[in-house]
Amino acid sequence: METLTSRQRTVLEFITAHVDRHGYPPTMREIARHLNVNGTLGVAKHLEALARKGYLQREPGNSRGITLTGQTRHTPTVSLPVIGVVRAGVPQIATEEIEEHISIDQSLVKGGAFFLRVKGDSMINAAIIEGDLALVRPQQTAENRDIVVAMIDGEATLKRFYQGADHIRLQPENPNMAPIIVRSGVQEAWIIGKVVGIYRRMD
């Protein structure tokens, strides 16, 4: 079967979950609401592509006329939220607002994982650029050299982690930028999670 774009996979995952939960497929308007888009024209195009690629069949004139093919369930996927913005540069508040959902292979993640969108160029030498989606596994500890999402005085930043005797160092991967030094009792800082993958859209 042909590969799917991230948006097509999100639609397919939502349809599959809806069928599993309710016993019948969603309408195009329900899919549009899930994608947080106005109108159903884009949804119709995604459904046409999924049908053309063999993942489902459509019944014209039926608002719920979507039938999943048997091959659809061979690779379990999970739909993860994209939340807020992490600024890879000067820390910026990460608003916990879900922008969209992206489906990936379920075997790649554990419960609670999410995507954060990267902004800035402080991690370019780690091949992380503006617009990338950082796949974050929630955890409160890290090892030296882990790339983490950390909160500093209520602001989020994505950096490489180093533990010192009385401080932590959040190191950018850009020689033109200085590290962030967080000393015990001076600033409030904690780790949100470890970056375990980077996803970049090519479309």
Swiss-Prot record:
Q: What class of enzyme is it?
A: hydrolase
Catalytic residues, chain numbering? 122 (for autocatalytic cleavage activity), 159 (for autocatalytic cleavage activity)
Catalysed reaction(s) here are: Hydrolysis of Ala-|-Gly bond in repressor LexA
Which EC numbers characterise this protein's activity in its record? 3.4.21.88
**Key words, A-Z:** Autocatalytic cleavage, DNA damage, DNA repair, DNA replication, DNA-binding, Hydrolase, Repressor, SOS response, Transcription, Transcription regulation
- DNA-binding region residues: the ranges are 28-48
GO BP, sorted A to Z: DNA repair; DNA replication; negative regulation of DNA-templated transcription; proteolysis; SOS response
The annotated subunit structure for this chain is: Homodimer.
NCBIfam families in UniProt? lexA
Q: What is the protein name stated in its UniProt record?
A: LexA repressor 2
Where does this protein come from, organism-wise? Answer: Geobacter sulfurreducens (strain ATCC 51573 / DSM 12127 / PCA)
